[in-house]
Amino acid sequence: MNIIKVKVVYALPDIQYIKEVHIDSNSTVKDAILASNLLNTVKNIQFYKNNVGIYNKLVHLNENVKNGDRIEIYRNLIIDPKERRRKRSNICLKK
């Protein structure tokens, strides 16, 4: 059994949670997230609803992780990016 080191990351607008965990080399993304204890630290993570990725590439929870991976838990969008740009440009035009 080999032990690897990965980081699990969850970012909010005002704070980032970064947990480094040591897990078995046969572990999955789900195993790493559970080992990080972020689900208990940050209450608004909806484990099975949020998308996850490794270095900005979407992956499934059952994907195997490698040493040095950065597992990212993504937040749901609050507002559509196109709508936000539209609102911002309207504000700038009014000034």
UniProtKB/Swiss-Prot annotation:
Give the residue range of the signal peptide.
none
Where are the coiled-coil regions?
none
Look up the domain of life of the source.
Bacteria
Name the family.
Answer: Belongs to the UPF0125 (RnfH) family.
Protein name according to UniProt: UPF0125 protein BUsg_244
Tell me the classification of the organism that encodes this protein. Bacteria, Pseudomonadati, Pseudomonadota, Gammaproteobacteria, Enterobacterales
